[in-house]
């Protein structure tokens, strides 16, 4: 039952940056012993609010009230001292230090200028035990997994007696087992009476953990859902984007041209049996399968990231020899990879450079001088047409949201003569509004005659976007479904591993 007095309240919070109004009149309450989710599209204001709560930013208007007391934090240390801790997606730890040193960084127990390592390790051990973690406090942090790093970050918050702990996209780099462990810890923290704020784009996580959900849109408060029995996926999407869920995918029947891409008994590392399929001009074919099905491995082989070990790839009925990505690009086949940060973008380069990097070679002056005029025009054109939200073309792409990074990668390939596009998990870790924009780009490419082959583990997405669904299971094609006939039961039935007849 909800308490009558909130432990944390936001009262009329506004935040303005030069030329940008990031937050306007944000007001809502959070209660002790609850997980309160914050949802909204990228740019909705969630991260800005957390930075105000943590002392990174001062609000332009309004106030933060904690346990009935109006607070004003000059910096993050002041917020920590008031019991506020933020667990960011990019963890703020020191790899070369020990686990214990990271937990008590800034408050190491010492006497006469010498750190009391025995006491340090003992106290750190208590915090780790509290979280159910069997880790030697004297272990250098660099030897731990990302999931263990996160537990150290939480232990660091508990060591400062944090009563308010906010998690910002905490599962983005975790394995399934690490996610389960994180959820166990969050539920324990809730039982202890702490306020938990949880930011995620993943609906299944929100429904698994939350006692309340507050939705933001364009820097404004939309609604707080407090009865979790009465809220569903569709209601959340509508609150976030102002559209019904049926409008998100926007699929419509279309006509197709001649066969554009054909795989004839193709094998690649991670693909167990030869794969044969075809995609016509203007057709969108979705590859669906569970983890380990071989979708990404097939995509990498087709683009030359790994070597095709058998079979033949054809584009417009012509055999293509693909031994490296440049061969695929020259043939008109492009890839948006699954891990866009590691394999798609060049993080420390500008949006302009990331869009132009592939087609640049075709527009150099005199064979060696970069054509700045063409590059500026090309980047600006794709920023406008793809609605890439950036202060300008010279902004570092690492500072953009995942959805805008993905659109920049699409802009890169739109600068080429594209016949086939391979999309591997194109909307992973992207908010629902940006997903809608990505789908529209996919439809536009199909309308231009591009053959689209996209792999996704998001079954509703595959069913909602693809004209035809090819289901993979353990490195082989298990079946094929047409858009008008496909449903989740059929697709999952095909995707599930076969039970061995040898098992009793």
Curated annotation (Swiss-Prot):
**Main location class:** membrane
Recorded catalytic activity of this chain's protein: L-arabinose(out) + ATP + H2O = L-arabinose(in) + ADP + phosphate + H(+)
Q: Which SUPFAM superfamilies does this entry report, sorted A to Z?
A: P-loop containing nucleoside triphosphate hydrolases
Question: Cross-referenced CDD domains, in alphabetical order?
Answer: ABC_Carb_Monos_I, ABC_Carb_Monos_II
Q: Which UniProt keywords apply?
A: ATP-binding, Cell inner membrane, Cell membrane, Membrane, Nucleotide-binding, Repeat, Sugar transport, Translocase, Transport
- What is this enzyme's class at the first EC digit? translocase
Membrane topology term? Peripheral membrane protein
* Localisation per UniProt entry: Cell inner membrane
The record's Gene Ontology cellular component field reads: plasma membrane
Any Pfam family the entry gives: ABC_tran
Which positions in this protein are listed as binding ATP? 40-47
Residue span(s) of domain ABC transporter: 8-243, 256-499
Superkingdom, taxonomy of origin = Bacteria
Question: Which Gene Ontology terms cover its molecular function?
Answer: ABC-type L-arabinose transporter activity; ATP binding; ATP hydrolysis activity
Q: Which residues form a coiled coil?
A: none
What the entry lists under Gene3D superfamilies is as follows: P-loop containing nucleotide triphosphate hydrolases
Q: Which family does it belong to?
A: Belongs to the ABC transporter superfamily. Arabinose importer (TC 3.A.1.2.2) family.
Q: What does this protein do?
A: Part of the ABC transporter complex AraFGH involved in arabinose import. Responsible for energy coupling to the transport system.
The record's NCBIfam families line, in alphabetical order, gives: PRK11288.1
Record text on subunit structure and interactions: The complex is composed of two ATP-binding proteins (AraG), two transmembrane proteins (AraH) and a solute-binding protein (AraF).
Please report the name of this protein according to its UniProt entry.
Arabinose import ATP-binding protein AraG
Q: Which organism is it from?
A: Shigella sonnei (strain Ss046)
Query: Gene name, please?
Result: araG
């Amino acid at each position: 039952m909800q308490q009558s007095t909130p432990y944390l309240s936001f009262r009329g919070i506004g935040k303005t940056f030069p030329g940008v109004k990031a937050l306007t009149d944000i007001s809502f309450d959070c209660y002790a012993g609850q997980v309160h989710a914050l949802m909204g599209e990228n740019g909705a204001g969630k991260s800005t609010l957390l930075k105000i709560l943590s002392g990174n930013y001062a609000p332009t208007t309004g106030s933060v009230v904690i346990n009935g007391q109006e607070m004003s934090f000059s910096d993050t240390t002041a917020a920590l001292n008031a019991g506020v801790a933020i667990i960011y997606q990019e963890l703020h730890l020191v790899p070369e230090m020990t686990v214990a040193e990271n937990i008590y960084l800034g408050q190491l127990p010492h006497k006469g200028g010498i750190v009391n390592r025995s006491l340090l390790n003992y106290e750190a051990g208590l915090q780790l035990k509290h979280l159910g973690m069997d880790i030697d406090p004297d272990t250098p942090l660099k030897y731990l997994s990302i999931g263990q790093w996160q537990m150290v970050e939480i232990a660091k918050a508990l060591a400062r007696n944090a009563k308010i702990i906010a998690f910002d996209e905490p599962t983005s780099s975790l394995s399934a087992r690490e996610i389960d462990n994180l959820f166990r810890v969050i539920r324990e923290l809730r039982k202890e009476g702490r306020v938990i704020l949880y930011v995620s784009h993943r609906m299944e996580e929100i429904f698994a953990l939350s006692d309340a959900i507050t939705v933001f849109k364009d820097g404004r408060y939309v609604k707080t859902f407090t009865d979790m029995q009465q809220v569903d996926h569709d209601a959340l999407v509508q609150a976030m984007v102002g559209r019904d869920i049926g409008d998100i995918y926007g699929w419509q029947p279309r006509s197709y041209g001649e066969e554009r891409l054909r795989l004839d008994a193709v094998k690649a590392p991670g693909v167990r049996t030869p794969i044969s399929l075809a995609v016509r001009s203007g057709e969108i074919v979705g590859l669906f399968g569970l983890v380990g099905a071989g979708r990404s491995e097939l995509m990498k082989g087709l683009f030359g990231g790994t070597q095709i070990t058998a079979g033949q790839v054809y584009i417009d009925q012509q055999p293509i020899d693909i031994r490296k990505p440049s061969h695929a690009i020259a043939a008109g086949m492009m890839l948006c990879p699954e891990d866009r940060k590691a394999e798609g973008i060049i993080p420390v380069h500008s949006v302009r450079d990331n869009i132009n990097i592939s087609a640049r070679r075709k527009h150099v002056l005199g064979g060696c001088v970069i054509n700045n005029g063409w590059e500026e025009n090309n980047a600006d054109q794709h920023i406008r047409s793809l609605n890439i939200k950036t202060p300008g073309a010279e902004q570092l792409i690492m500072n953009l949201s995942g959805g805008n990074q993905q659109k920049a990668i699409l802009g890169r390939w739109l600068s080429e003569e594209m016949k086939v596009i391979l999309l591997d998990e194109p909307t992973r870790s992207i908010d629902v509004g940006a997903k809608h924009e990505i789908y529209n780009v996919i439809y536009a490419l199909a309308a231009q005659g591009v053959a689209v082959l996209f792999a996704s583990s998001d079954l509703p997405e595959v069913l909602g976007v693809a004209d035809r669904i090819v289901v993979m299971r353990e490195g082989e094609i298990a079946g094929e479904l047409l858009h008008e006939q496909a449903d989740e039961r059929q697709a999952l039935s095909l995707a599930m591993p076969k039970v061995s007849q040898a098992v009793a």
